[in-house]
Structure formats: C-alpha cells, structure tokens
C-alpha cells in the first residue's frame, strides 16, 4: 500500500493489516 505520510503509524498499521490479510 502507499501512505502519504510514512510516519503515520495508523496508516502503516492498516497497510500491513491489508498485506497480512
């Protein structure tokens, strides 16, 4: 996925959730 702000942990968290599932 792509997060506009790579320091946005909430964005990254959901990104990784999407990758895991």
From Swiss-Prot:
- Which Pfam family, any one, appears in the UniProt record? Endothelin
Biological processes per GO annotation: regulation of vasoconstriction; vasoconstriction
Drop me one GO molecular function for this one.
toxin activity
Q: Which InterPro entries match?
A: Endothelin_toxin_CS (IPR019764), Endothln-like_toxin (IPR001928)
Would you tell me the Gene Ontology cellular component terms? extracellular region
Q: Where is this site: Endothelin-receptor binding site?
A: 21
Found, by tissue, as follows: Expressed by the venom gland.
Its principal location? Answer: secreted
Location(s) in or outside the cell? Secreted
Q: Which domain of life is it from?
A: Eukaryota
The residues forming the signal peptide are none
Where in the chain are disulfide-linked cysteines found?
A: 1-15, 3-11
**Which keywords are on file for this protein?**
Cardiotoxin, Disulfide bond, G-protein coupled receptor impairing toxin, Secreted, Toxin, Vasoactive, Vasoconstrictor
Summarizing the function annotation, the protein's role is:
Vasoconstrictor activity. These toxins cause cardiac arrest probably as a result of coronary vasospasm. May act by displaying agonistic activities towards endothelin-1 and -2 receptors (EDNRA and EDNRB).
Give the protein family.
Belongs to the endothelin/sarafotoxin family.
Please report the name of this protein according to its UniProt entry: Sarafotoxin-D
Organism of this sequence: Atractaspis engaddensis
């Amino acid at each position: 996925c792509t997060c506009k702000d790579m320091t946005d942990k909430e964005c990254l968290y959901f990104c990784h959730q999407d990758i895991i599932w």
